[in-house]
Structures are given as C-alpha cells and as structure tokens.
From Swiss-Prot:
Keyword annotations from UniProtKB, A to Z: Ribonucleoprotein, Ribosomal protein
Domain of life: Bacteria
Phylogenetic lineage: Bacteria, Bacillati, Cyanobacteriota, Cyanophyceae, Synechococcales
Pfam families registered for this protein in UniProt: Ribosomal_L34 (PF00468)
GO terms of molecular function: structural constituent of ribosome
Gene Ontology biological-process entries: translation
Listed name of the protein: Large ribosomal subunit protein bL34
Record carries keyword Metal-binding: no
Family recorded in the similarity comment: Belongs to the bacterial ribosomal protein bL34 family.
HAMAP family (alphabetical): Ribosomal_bL34
Record region (Disordered): 1-24
PROSITE patterns in the cross-refs: RIBOSOMAL_L34 (PS00784)
Gene Ontology cellular component annotations, sorted alphabetically: ribonucleoprotein complex; ribosome
Length: 45
C-alpha cells in the first residue's frame, strides 16, 4: 500500500489561495464572486 505523501502547509496554503490574496487581483475577485453566487460556506481557504 502506498503512503499519503501530501503533508499540507497552512502558511503556504494561505499565501497562495487565502482570501486576501484572492482580493488582490481581478481574477481572484471573480473567484470570490462566483463562490458567493454559488453559496459556498468557505469562500477561500
């Protein structure tokens, strides 16, 4: 059986796909908008 190799780093995840990072760019804001429209509980990480 293979091991799960993905550890996941909270800081890196926030820096790449956090809310404030999304709000910086036009396309990021579009992501937030579409997720709001869809009714997502979590808009960003």
């Amino acid at each position: 059986m293979t091991k799960r190799t993905f550890g996941g780093t909270s800081r890196k995840r926030k820096r790449v796909s956090g809310f404030r990072v999304r709000m910086r760019t036009h396309t990021g804001r579009r992501v937030i908008r579409s997720r709001r429209k869809r009714g997502r509980t979590r808009l960003a990480v």
